[in-house]
Amino acid sequence: MRFINHGVCGATLILAAGGAAAADSSVTLYGVVDANIQYLDNGGVHSYSEKSGGSTGSLFGLKGTEDLGGGLKAQFNVETGFNVNNGGLFADTSALFYRQAWVGLSDARYGSLTMGRQYEPSFRVVCPADPFRANEVLSPFSANVLAIDRNTLSTQYDSGRASNSIMYQSPDLKGLKLYGMYAFSATVSQPVPATTGNMLNVAATYSGYGFYAGLAYVNQHPGQETIAGLPTSLSLLGTEHFIGALAYRIGIVNLQFNYSYNRAQDPAPGSLAAHLGTGHSLSIAELGATIQATPADAITIAGVQRNVRGAHDNAPSFELGVDHSISQRTSLYMRAGYIKNNGTATVSWPGVTVTAPGTKQVLATVGMTHRF
């Protein structure tokens, strides 16, 4: 075993019995350490705290490939997240590699087939069209997707990652990529304990000439979730997701837009979901831009609108970000955001509990990111 330093890519572990095999197989250790100081006004309750993952989630992982000959490769990736402020695992503490854990085969001519816990095709569609790249802590898009809202508790959200999944990804067809995923039932603990049903997730993206476009369709089968304070488990209704994303670069400005509509099935008459009215459909729209002001400075801005159908429940939110690169691996950043809940809406930054429906949140943070 020997170490090879690849700079930004981190340290590479080459596992081989001899010199010839060393050129055919590799394992790369990589990661991100991100910490920030945050001010939050949560419905009039003010607080200061240290947080992890404000720009990019703090993480580390291992990925590797083996050349099998004839253009065929075996590959794997295992990746976990952690809180740099206390050293604990991030979010789902029951899973060691909660971010990614998959293995598969790839071929430059035919594409790749992978199995395990992996990013969904629909997430791959949205990410390039969100200025904050669907960050789990401070992206306003993620705040709206992950909102724990009474009117939509039974409407399944698009989580971004799927366990027990198998996915095909086509090769790059002159800018066009196709994705198809099927995931079997899985149990999760975040943001609430739940068992999701099987899921079909398909997508297509195109990138070229400064233009990006993506479409995705998701069909999630029914499941169950546990909500504190309810006498029994709550049904997760079968939910369809329709997602579109666009981006266009004009000089130093990259304009970005995405829209998603989550359509839930009607709850069974007499069920707890029907009695509580937790199965409303909803839409999320985001418009923003990324501005590369200088080679070292980027400005990001986004506005998001979440609307729940059939209820007085909507939440406009805005966020501004500035990132300054000190080196290829180290950067400083600032974020300032605002969420206004209207009616019964309870949208919040991930990990923050809303003090009461209809309240606002104001957030400001400064932090540092280092990649290895």
Per-range role (PLM):
Residues 201-319, 335:
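Detector for outer-membrane/organellar transmembrane beta-barrel domains
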Residues 17-20:
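N-terminal signal peptide c-region/cleavage motif recognized by signal peptidases
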Residues 326, 358-372:
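Outer-membrane beta-barrel "beta-signal"
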Residues 61-63, 102-105, 167-169, 203-205, ...:
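Outer-membrane beta-barrel architecture
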Residues 27-35, 70, 74-78, 113, ...:
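Transmembrane beta-strands of outer-membrane beta-barrel proteins
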Residues 35-41, 80-84, 119-121, 182-186, ...:
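Transmembrane beta-strands of outer-membrane beta-barrel pores
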Residues 24-40, 48-184, 196, 205-209:
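Outer membrane beta-barrel
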